[in-house]
Amino acid sequence: MQKQRFCLDTTAITDSDVRKSLGVSNISESAEKIMDIVAQARVQLDISCHIPYNTVYKELIGFLIREECAPETLIKVDTWLVKKTPNRYEIKIPAEIFHEYIKDLRERINKGMRISENAMYETALEAYILSKPDEKDKEDVLNEVLSKTVNSFRDKYRNTLRGGTLDSAPDLDVLLLAKELDAAVVANDEGIEKWAQRLGLRFVNARDFPFILQEYLDLWDKK
């Protein structure tokens, strides 16, 4: 049987869906539960869980510290997650993947530009409508219109440019390390999932990950 390896994104530990699936209320509890299962899987079944260093590792540790996780939990992360930097100079990625990525990025930029243009038009129109009847103060009109338009613009722009694509170095490192190690990617991120499929990598949704490991352990205990 081929050795099982998993490559974890930050969302494998921190995502809210993971907490719900485990029946816990905070990140500290979910992180500790996951690390305990990862430790058992490593000791009993030699299943290794990897995390890209230092991009994803630094992101995860920073998140856990901000959530005031116990020092013992941080020690478990350091102990049971194998930290490794992807060999970015040796990993081979098909040129077609880069072609698809650039094409996807260009389409998103164009959509983002159209959203920006629409936001400017909506701002001007709202300002005109609000200022005409009552001769409102200029600053009041600007503040009222801009706060509404900017919030709407941010949501639309973020969803258009960042949703379903790779938008950070940690995201890319997860895929590169998984490819290097022939490991399954563990995340709850549309962009990572989409490009993992494009690269022919196994993908495990973060909310299912602890239960998959537990299933391995339960079967082993029955032997």
Swiss-Prot record:
First and last residue of the signal peptide: none
MF (Gene Ontology): ribonuclease P activity
Keywords: Endonuclease, Hydrolase, Nuclease, tRNA processing
InterPro entries, A to Z: RNA_free_RNase_P (IPR014856)
Keyword Hydrolase among UniProt keywords: yes
Stretches that traverse the bilayer: none
A Gene Ontology biological process term: tRNA 5'-leader removal
EC number: 3.1.26.5
Intrachain disulfide bonds: none
Catalytic activity annotation: Endonucleolytic cleavage of RNA, removing 5'-extranucleotides from tRNA precursor
NCBIfam families per the UniProt record, alphabetical: PRK04358.1-1 (NF003340), PRK04358.1-4 (NF003343), RNA_lig_partner (TIGR03875)
Family: Belongs to the HARP family.
The protein's role, per its UniProt record: RNA-free RNase P that catalyzes the removal of the 5'-leader sequence from pre-tRNA to produce the mature 5'-terminus.
Name of this protein: RNA-free ribonuclease P
Organism of derivation: Methanococcus maripaludis (strain C6 / ATCC BAA-1332)
Classification of source organism: Archaea, Methanobacteriati, Methanobacteriota, Methanomada group, Methanococci
